[in-house]
Design a protein with these regions (language model features):
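Extreme N-terminal starter segment of soluble prokaryotic enzymes
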Residues: 1-4
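Acidic/glycine-enriched connector segments
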Residues: 8-119
Length: 119
C-alpha cells in the first residue's frame, strides 16, 4: 500500500484537467493505495477528493491551519510531501506557488524523480 499525493494549481480546474489527472492516477494506483491532499476547493486538491469519492478510496486531507498566518499553506504542503510515496501535480504554466513548493519538498525527501508525476 502506498500513499499518492495529489496537488495542483487552482488555475487548473477544468474537466479536461481532471481527466488528465485521472489518467495518471489510474497508471500508478494499486489496490489498497490511499490519497493525500490539501483540501483546496479548486484544482488538484479537488480532483483528489473527486477520485477518492468516485473510487471509494481513503483520503487524508491536510487542511492549512490559517491561525499560523500566511505561511499556513506552505506548512501544510510539508505534511503532504512527507506523507506521499508518489506525487501527482497538476501544474500551472508559471510553475510557482504552493504546488511547486510541494513538489520541491517531496523530491528533497524521496530523491527519486520517477515518483513525481507532472500533468
Amino acid at each position: 500500500m502506498k500513499k499518492i499525493g495529489i496537488v495542483g494549481s487552482r488555475s487548473r480546474d477544468s474537466e479536461k484537467d481532471f481527466k488528465i489527472c485521472e489518467v495518471k492516477f489510474r497508471e500508478i494506483y494499486e489496490e489498497g493505495d490511499e490519497i493525500v491532499s490539501g483540501g483546496c476547493p479548486r484544482g488538484g486538491d479537488r480532483f483528489a477528493e473527486r477520485l477518492a469519492k468516485k473510487r471509494g478510496i481513503p483520503i487524508k486531507i491536510y487542511f492549512p491551519d490559517w491561525s499560523l498566518g500566511k505561511n499556513a499553506g506552505f506548512i501544510r504542503n510539508t505534511f503532504i510531501a512527507q506523507d506521499a510515496d508518489e506525487l501527482i501535480s497538476v501544474v500551472a504554466e508559471d510553475r510557482t506557488g504552493g504546488t511547486e513548493d510541494t513538489i520541491s519538498k517531496f523530491l528533497s525527501r524521496v530523491n527519486d524523480e520517477s515518483k513525481s508525476h507532472l500533468v
